[in-house]
């Protein structure tokens, strides 16, 4: 293992410190928070998010609030700058072209690019794929990490040292930094992964120079694969994954993190590195990996995947914490906003089928379809709730990455690459228009105590 040669903390010391903490820190009862009107998790009692700001970037729609205050479930919509992602995905299909770069422009600037603007923008991103001179050696090769998200966050922070105007908060500078990060982050990811393979997995590593004229999806596949070969359909499907993950409103954990840091007046690299750190958390960015692992477990234990009764019974056991990883969660099901459907999941499910059947993933694809179809009824029976539960984007995204031969190490990093344009768009909006530091309040519930001189303790 590649760790600094420093002495470990004594287990007895750690136990002593833990006991000290437990002795002086009482449990924070959530019922007290409810009585005080605290919006835990910045959620309203009905599960909807607290209104914390306004934005022009995107809109996440999963329900309608009726005049009496109740919620009416509706089919989900995700709207980038006034355009539904369904429309963007359909346009990509209609003209058989890559759409992510156009979505990046749309999110950053607020309108669709002209043909000339689009061509110049793609060229601009293409010309900035390479990392600054010496960066790969100094910041990546000399300090590997077993976790690619950790390495990406550190790499982004390190970019501060290569930027003469790192703290400049003017619009031209923030846009310059944003475009550079959007272009360079895929290269950082693949380089970090190759080094991880060599140092931690004891496998061969290889580095490819970016190929001119490639889309972001093509660049990722060609730089990731040893032979640099991929099919147009594979690249198009990855491009679609990037498209549907590019933004998701201002209230999700990583985007809100970006806004909180941006409101303080800090630099772009600190804000985006913090967003990567937030996305690294398994409650936010790692669900598609858990879906894949759960899918393998289900296929291992269900003798007949086409038998709905057998599948239903195993899902019931998962909910009861009698099967799976013991969490009681059916990964890929349920969402904080969407009720009837997640438009991102609908898009990926439809577009993934052909490649799944072509590459021999028919059984996996069909099982995910069965989970989507059967799980809502099981939730209703087991939880005794009429609240609608739909499949979310993670249900099929992990399978797509698996079909593309992408390592599980890169599932969440790919999410980060897709989401950087959204983070940057929200950062620009926060810096240029908000102009007020985000500062919510916490109620102190601790004890009052008098100070004792140290010689009396």
Where are these regions (language model features)?
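Non-transmembrane, aqueous-exposed alpha-helical and coiled segments at domain scale
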Residues: 1-457
């Amino acid at each position: 293992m590649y760790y600094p040669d420093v002495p470990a903390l004594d287990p007895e010391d750690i136990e002593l410190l833990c006991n000290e903490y437990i002795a002086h820190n009482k449990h924070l009862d959530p019922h007290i928070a409810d009585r005080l009107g605290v919006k835990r998790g910045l959620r309203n009692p009905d599960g909807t998010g607290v209104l914390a700001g306004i934005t022009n970037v995107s809109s996440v729609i999963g329900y309608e609030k009726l005049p009496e205050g109740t919620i009416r479930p509706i089919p989900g919509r995700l709207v980038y700058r006034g355009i539904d992602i369904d429309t963007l995905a359909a346009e990509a299909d209609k003209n058989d072209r890559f759409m992510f770069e156009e979505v990046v422009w749309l999110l950053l600037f607020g309108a669709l690019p002209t043909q000339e603007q689009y061509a110049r923008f793609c060229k601009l991103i293409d010309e900035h794929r390479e990392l600054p001179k010496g960066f790969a050696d100094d910041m990546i090769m000399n300090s590997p990490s077993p976790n690619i998200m950790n390495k990406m966050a550190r790499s982004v922070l390190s970019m501060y040292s290569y930027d003469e105007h790192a703290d400049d908060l003017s619009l031209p500078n923030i846009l310059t930094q944003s475009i550079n990060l959007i272009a360079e982050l895929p290269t950082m990811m693949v380089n970090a992964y190759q080094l991880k393979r060599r140092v931690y997995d004891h496998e061969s590593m290889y580095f490819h120079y970016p190929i001119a004229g490639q889309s972001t999806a093509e660049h990722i596949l060609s730089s990731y694969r040893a032979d640099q070969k991929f099919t147009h359909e594979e690249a198009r499907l990855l491009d679609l994954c990037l498209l549907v993950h590019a933004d998701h409103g201002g209230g999700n954990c990583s985007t809100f993190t970006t806004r909180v840091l941006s409101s303080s007046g800090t630099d772009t690299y600190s804000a985006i590195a913090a967003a990567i750190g937030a996305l690294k958390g398994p409650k936010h960015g790692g669900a598609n990996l858990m879906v894949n692992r759960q899918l393998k477990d289900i296929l291992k234990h269900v003798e007949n995947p086409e038998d709905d009764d057998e599948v239903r019974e195993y899902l019931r056991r998962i909910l009861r914490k009698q099967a799976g990883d013991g969490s009681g969660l059916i990964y890929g099901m349920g969402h904080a906003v969407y009720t009837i459907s997640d438009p991102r999941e609908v898009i990926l499910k439809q577009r993934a089928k052909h490649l799944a059947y072509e590459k021999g993933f028919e059984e996996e694809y069909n099982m995910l379809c069965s989970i989507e179809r059967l799980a809502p009824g099981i939730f209703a029976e087991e939880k005794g709730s009429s609240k609608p539960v739909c499949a979310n984007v993670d249900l099929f995204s992990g399978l797509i990455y698996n079909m593309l031969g992408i390592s599980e190490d890169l599932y969440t990093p790919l999410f980060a690459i897709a989401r950087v344009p959204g983070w940057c768009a929200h950062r620009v909006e926060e810096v240029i228009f908000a102009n007020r530091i985000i500062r919510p309040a916490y109620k102190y519930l601790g004890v009052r105590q008098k100070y004792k001189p140290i010689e009396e303790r």
